[in-house]
Regions:
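Active-site hotspot residues in diverse enzymes, especially metal/ion-binding acidic/histidine motifs
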Residues: 1-143
């Protein structure tokens, strides 16, 4: 079940550095709730998504699980206050927060024992492989 937060709860979470957010949340609803427009384009210079801190661009034509994961990642950048390209540390923080937003740790832990590969787990969770990895890492597991 997806958790729903109202705008006041999101603002409170943002002020707290988004540390108290825990998924799963609907990234499309989150974008709408915090007033972040999402556009689809084929021109992202090889990237799956991008943000300037106010707007998100997603590569058109992605598989639904990759699109959801990319949107969660770009929203994480916004929640963390990122407004431009990030170094590896900034990307790491966005990856970890995106996994917390999109994945429920109890579900990740439970399904991990049932799946034989990271790819299979990603399919079950409805996320891409990268975000699933960070979800495992957040649960103190390694793939």
């Amino acid at each position: 079940m997806l958790k729903r937060f109202n705008e006041e709860e999101w603002r409170s979470a943002l002020e707290a550095g988004a540390k108290n957010l825990q998924g799963p949340v609907d990234p499309y609803l989150l974008a709408e709730t915090i007033g972040t427009p999402v556009s689809y384009t084929k021109d992202l210079a090889g990237a799956l998504g991008a943000t300037d801190g106010r707007h998100i661009w997603i590569r058109a034509g992605l598989r639904p699980s990759v699109e959801r994961s990319t949107l969660a990642h770009e929203l994480a950048h916004i929640l963390l206050g990122h407004t431009s390209c990030q170094d590896s540390r900034g990307e790491l923080r966005a990856n970890r927060l995106a996994a917390r937003l999109l994945l429920d740790p109890d579900t990740v832990s439970r399904e991990r024992t049932r799946c034989s590969s990271l790819s299979e787990l990603a399919d079950v969770l409805g996320a891409d492989v990268d975000l699933t990895f960070w979800g495992l890492e957040a649960c103190d597991h390694t793939p």
